[in-house]
């Protein structure tokens, strides 16, 4: 498997004449910082345009990208200095990934009913992040590296299973626009979060493995944090549009 990964990485080692994986990864740190900052401004500016019961969701979206923007600013500087920003990245994840999971019960309006579900999701998430960190700082390819990586993968799969098997009734009971958004958001957890373990395995690819791993992480963070928030936003706005149309259609009947 290591040989296959090394062969795959070799084809990417030099994207063009002087643009190496290392320099491309550095640029992506700053691009991610800009994307997170722009998304934060957008989410907070648009907060007042969504129905009041969904404004907390927009606040959470803005917090996720705002926290990530700060961390990416710091991580870019650390990477520029020749080190991998592992600690900063995991601090970011331990804060932002639970916030991402909070958005499911918020959008579905589960209230107190969602506390047990949320506690389960957050507990699994923290196990995933903690074990992934231990794997990350272990010797690459060693027994501890693989063992903790596999535990983190199991925790991630349990998060996916929880979202797909314990929220079915709540999704069916939600308005169509919200249920559609939640289904897409589940897809982000299923597919988007799968980029992280793939990126983790890039460390096996040789001299550029660490930079390639960071590149995967950067791309995944932008897709998941910005995209996740935008899906929630457009779902809420679609529902608001339908509710507005229904109110307008009912007004002539009321006046008659």
PLM regions with names:
Residues 2-89, 98-256:
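Polytopic alpha-helical membrane-helix bundles and their juxtamembrane interface segments
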